[in-house]
């Protein structure tokens, strides 16, 4: 499997990976136009725009878009994250030209019919309402806002209802003009694809765009704090976050390994201690997420009102204990989990295309799998313990609580427990 890269004269980047033996391909367009690229008054517009791309173009109706791909048995979708919006499809090899035409059309030529804007506005407001009614969704929005208050990285991707209710055609087209610039666009394809054919299609579709930079991005500033909402629910939910490195820092792999030891799977410390030994919860895990210039190690769990205090304190205690006595066997297991998860995931062309686009956006190149494995293997037990000790010593957290959480300790109490 060979990764090939083409840089168009206007700044659009094309990256492909042919995967021998496959009869299908995944391809799409990734745009550096996510939630953190919005101004306050635009919060939610990147996601709104993603929805509107499927509501029709100059030559296709919304039904035409869906039928074009599904008539050949394919799949088309999109997502908005804090740093990217992606439009992608999975089709059989012979249908790659069709899929590319559809995706480039919805990215470049959204119609923004005012009637369709109103219909989709209602859909998005329902999506926001559904998220608000889902505790283990909304708590992560609150945690993000608490970690990065009063800045784009801390705002929700869906946006607040008042903003979504006010967006019009001019707002959508204005955001396209700001962020859908050639320098922000990556065309990525993997599977049964021919690099030269994808390049030719990309040049034909995007070559007319005038060269333009991507625009500035406000730097992230982790501040932390507490967001507590008391509500009569069956479960008390809590999420605790520590700042970790951004994805350009090699220490991001140390953060991932520590997170895996702490709460990444059934053998992890939190799962074993909180669920298997004490029966305090059904769900508990730790995970990391990284952005260009910051990241978060997040711990989440839900439990009954009577157990929330003990579970939160146990989580902090296990984190401290891990900083003292993580073992080489645990580090080896975490390394194996990370490498196996990465390699097994990349057996899918969709995962490959996603990886190519993500790495191009970070490094403007595609580091080899071997290079990534070497970075994972380079993390020692001492590295992981020192990293964990640094988080414990700093004791700077973001804490979100939702449900019957009156007995849950406050953030200041957790800081004292970490420092003790």
Annotate each PLM feature:
Residues 1-10:
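Short, Gly/Pro- and small/polar-rich lid/capping loops
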Residues 1, 224-226, 269:
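Short beta-strand-initiation
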Residues 219-223, 273:
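Catalytic cores of enzymes that engage adenine nucleotides and/or redox cofactors via long glycine-rich
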Residues 7, 15-18, 62-217, 228, ...:
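Charge-rich, well-structured scaffold segments of protease-associated domains
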Residues 11, 18-69, 143, 180, ...:
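Active/ligand-binding-proximal structured segments within catalytic/core domains
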């Amino acid at each position: 499997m060979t990764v090939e890269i083409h840089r168009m004269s206007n700044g659009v980047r094309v990256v492909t990976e042919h995967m021998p033996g496959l009869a299908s391909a995944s391809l799409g367009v990734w745009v550096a136009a996510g939630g953190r690229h919005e101004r306050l008054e635009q919060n939610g517009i990147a996601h709104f725009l993603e929805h509107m791309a499927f509501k029709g173009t100059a030559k296709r109706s919304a039904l035409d878009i869906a039928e074009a791909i599904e008539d050949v048995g394919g799949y088309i979708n999109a997502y908005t994250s804090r740093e990217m919006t992606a439009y992608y499809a999975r089709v059989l090899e012979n249908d790659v030209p069709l899929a590319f035409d559809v995706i480039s059309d919805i990215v470049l030529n959204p119609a923004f019919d005012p009637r369709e804007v109103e219909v989709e506005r209602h859909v998005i407001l329902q999506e926001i309402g559904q998220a608000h009614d889902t505790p283990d969704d909304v708590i992560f929005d609150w945690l993000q806002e608490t970690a990065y208050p009063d800045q784009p990285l801390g705002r929700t991707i869906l946006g607040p209802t008042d903003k979504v209710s006010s967006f019009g055609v001019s707002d959508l087209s204005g955001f396209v003009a700001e962020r859908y610039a050639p320098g922000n666009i990556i065309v990525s394809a993997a599977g049964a694809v021919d690099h030269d054919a994808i390049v030719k299609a990309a040049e034909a579709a995007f070559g007319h765009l005038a060269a333009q930079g991507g625009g500035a991005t406000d730097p992230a500033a982790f501040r932390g704090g507490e967001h507590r909402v008391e509500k009569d629910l069956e479960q008390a939910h809590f999420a605790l976050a520590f700042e970790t490195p951004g994805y350009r820092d090699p220490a991001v792999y140390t953060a991932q390994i520590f997170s895996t030891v702490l709460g990444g799977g059934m053998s992890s410390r939190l799962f074993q201690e909180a669920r298997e030994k004490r029966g305090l919860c059904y769900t508990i895990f730790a995970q990391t997420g990284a952005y260009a210039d910051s990241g978060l190690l997040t711990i989440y769990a839900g439990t009954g009102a009577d157990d929330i205090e003990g579970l939160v304190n146990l989580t902090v205690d296990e984190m401290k204990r891990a900083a003292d006595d993580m073992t080489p066997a645990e580090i080896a297991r975490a390394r194996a989990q990370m490498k196996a998860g990465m390699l097994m995931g990349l057996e899918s062309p969709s995962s490959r295309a996603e990886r190519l686009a993500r790495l191009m956006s970070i490094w403007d190149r595609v580091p080899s799998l071997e290079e990534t494995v070497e970075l994972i293997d380079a993390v020692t037990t001492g590295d992981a313990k020192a990293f964990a000790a640094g988080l414990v010593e700093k004791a700077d957290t973001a804490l979100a609580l939702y449900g019957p959480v009156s007995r849950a300790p406050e953030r200041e109490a957790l800081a004292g427990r970490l420092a003790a």
